């Protein structure tokens, strides 16, 4: 049975309130933070304060993308040529390319089989005298083990940058994702639970890092200390010059959308979490299906993607691409909504640093080096797992039952008993 597409929630979602926020920007005559002072605080600063409050930290800097957020975090920490940064082998390529973009070397570590987050037990063996930081990624709907990662980082005097591109609002031991390490980096790209189409956010508790990150994203400028002294038409950004910056500023339109979307984030995350628990219970009853582990330290779990694993032997030798193709046809879902996990970075055709002369000179690694790496858990994950986009978790439970029924039907069709 194929069901109509309109049963599934679309993403992103907006309302009249969203449109009114955008209209405010049009009417303000200030469309960027590099615009002039109008007597009203910029949308960018309003959003930065709101997101900092949401996460319980003093400092927040919006920027152009999650990729940029990671790169600026690395630059603020002084990481560059000759340095190494530990990253998981299973993640979107931006985690690794951000390291390359500061002329440092990403060093891959495999992930845990039941969370798909970096395996802390494997981090220690990857540390060298060149290692400067660890970037744990909170992937799909899981959080990396921040207790163990921070312990390792402290032991070896390493920085921790949390890649929270897929984890806005998750909570580990009463701390929001992004606030547990030195810096948290978020993405607001179209598919994310907090989106403006594109965008990124950086949070930190460190005032000096905040100063540097502000300058790195705004051509070495910062907001002036006292806006009350500004006249209409004055520039609110002032020269600083502590560190060479570039222009990675978020527009006022994007900031307005994020400010609006943030109001509903916790409520929508709660719906996703409840429906994910329903799927966990229902899918775990199907022979050959395993759901992902939720560590006891996680009190709130944000689902960018709901992931389940299947045993290819019990499903007639199907791989993840074939499994997805059958489910998409049955459920009338496009590839945006249902797909396998990423290929491991070292096997992903989108990761090709040897094609840029800059990277060959800075990290000096060839295609044979990258493609010759081997991380078994990450490599199995891409062939034996299914990712369902978080928008589907906003559907009615009766519609989610159709998803469970489709997987169960597939299990019956291909079931191999032992």
UniProtKB/Swiss-Prot annotation:
Pathway(s): Metabolic intermediate biosynthesis; 2-deoxystreptamine biosynthesis; 2-deoxystreptamine from D-glucose 6-phosphate: step 2/4; Metabolic intermediate biosynthesis; 2-deoxystreptamine biosynthesis; 2-deoxystreptamine from D-glucose 6-phosphate: step 4/4; Antibiotic biosynthesis; butirosin biosynthesis
Cofactor(s) needed: pyridoxal 5'-phosphate
Record GO terms (molecular function): pyridoxal phosphate binding; transaminase activity
Catalytic activity, as annotated: 2-deoxy-L-scyllo-inosose + L-glutamine = 2-deoxy-scyllo-inosamine + 2-oxoglutaramate; 3-amino-2,3-dideoxy-scyllo-inosose + L-glutamine = 2-deoxystreptamine + 2-oxoglutaramate
Enzyme Commission number: 2.6.1.100, 2.6.1.101
Keywords per UniProt: Aminotransferase, Antibiotic biosynthesis, Pyridoxal phosphate, Transferase
Gene3D superfamilies reported for this sequence: Aspartate Aminotransferase, domain 1 (3.90.1150.10), Type I PLP-dependent aspartate aminotransferase-like (Major domain) (3.40.640.10)
Modified residues (N6-(pyridoxal phosphate)lysine): 192
InterPro entries: DegT/StrS_aminotransferase, PyrdxlP-dep_Trfase, PyrdxlP-dep_Trfase_major, PyrdxlP-dep_Trfase_small
Enzyme class: transferase
Keyword Repeat: no
GO biological process, one term: antibiotic biosynthetic process
Family as reported in the entry's similarity comment: Belongs to the DegT/DnrJ/EryC1 family. L-glutamine:2-deoxy-scyllo-inosose/scyllo-inosose aminotransferase subfamily.
Reported function: Catalyzes the PLP-dependent transamination of 2-deoxy-scyllo-inosose (2-DOI) to form 2-deoxy-scyllo-inosamine (2-DOIA) using L-glutamine as the amino donor. Also catalyzes the transamination of 3-amino-2,3-dideoxy-scyllo-inosose (keto-2-DOIA) into 2-deoxystreptamine (2-DOS).
Name of this chain's protein: L-glutamine:2-deoxy-scyllo-inosose aminotransferase
Organism in which the protein naturally occurs: Niallia circulans
Organism ancestry: Bacteria, Bacillati, Bacillota, Bacilli, Bacillales
Gene from which this protein is expressed: btrR
């Amino acid at each position: 049975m194929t069901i109509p597409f309109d049963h599934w929630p679309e993403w992103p979602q907006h309302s009249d309130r969203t449109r009114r926020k955008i209209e405010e920007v049009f009417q303000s005559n200030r469309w960027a933070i590099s615009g002039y002072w109008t007597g009203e605080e910029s949308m960018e600063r309003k959003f930065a304060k709101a997101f900092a409050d949401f996460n319980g930290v003093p400092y927040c800097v919006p920027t152009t993308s999650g990729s940029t957020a990671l790169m600026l975090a690395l630059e603020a920490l002084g990481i560059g040529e000759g340095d190494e940064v530990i990253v998981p082998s299973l993640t979107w390529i931006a985690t690794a390319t951000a390291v390359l973009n500061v002329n440092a070397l990403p060093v891959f570590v495999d992930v845990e089989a039941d969370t798909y987050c970096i395996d802390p037990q494997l981090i220690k063996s990857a540390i060298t005298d060149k290692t400067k930081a660890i970037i744990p990624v909170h992937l799909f709907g899981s959080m990396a083990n921040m207790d163990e990662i921070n312990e390792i980082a402290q032991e070896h005097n390493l920085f921790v940058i949390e890649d929270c591109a897929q984890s806005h609002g998750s909570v580990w031991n009463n701390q929001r994702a992004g606030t547990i390490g030195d810096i948290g980096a978020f993405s607001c790209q179209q598919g994310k639970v907090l989106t403006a189409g594109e965008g990124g956010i950086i949070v930190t508790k460190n005032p000096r890092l905040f100063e540097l990150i502000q300058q790195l994203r705004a051509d070495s400028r910062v907001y002036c200390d006292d806006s009350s002294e500004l006249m209409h038409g004055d520039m609110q950004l002032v020269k600083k010059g502590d560190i060479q910056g570039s222009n990675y500023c978020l527009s006022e339109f994007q900031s307005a959308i994020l400010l609006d979307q943030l109001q509903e984030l916790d409520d929508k995350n709660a719906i996703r979490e409840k429906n994910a628990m329903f799927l966990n219970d229902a899918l775990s009853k199907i022979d050959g299906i395993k759901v992902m582990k939720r560590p006891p330290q996680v009190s709130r779990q944000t689902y960018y993607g709901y992931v389940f694993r299947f045993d290819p032997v019990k499903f007639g030798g199907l791989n993840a691409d074939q499994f997805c193709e059958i489910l998409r046809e049955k459920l009338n879902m496009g590839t945006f909504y249902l797909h396998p996990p990423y290929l491991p970075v070292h096997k992903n055709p989108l990761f090709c640093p040897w094609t840029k002369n800059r990277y060959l000179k800075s990290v000096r690694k060839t295609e044979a080096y990258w493609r010759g790496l081997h991380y078994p858990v990450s490599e199995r994950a891409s062939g034996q797992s299914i990712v369902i986009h978080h928008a589907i978790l906003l559907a009615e439970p009766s519609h989610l039952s159709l998803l469970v029924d489709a997987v169960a039907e597939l299990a019956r069709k291909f079931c191999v008993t032992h």
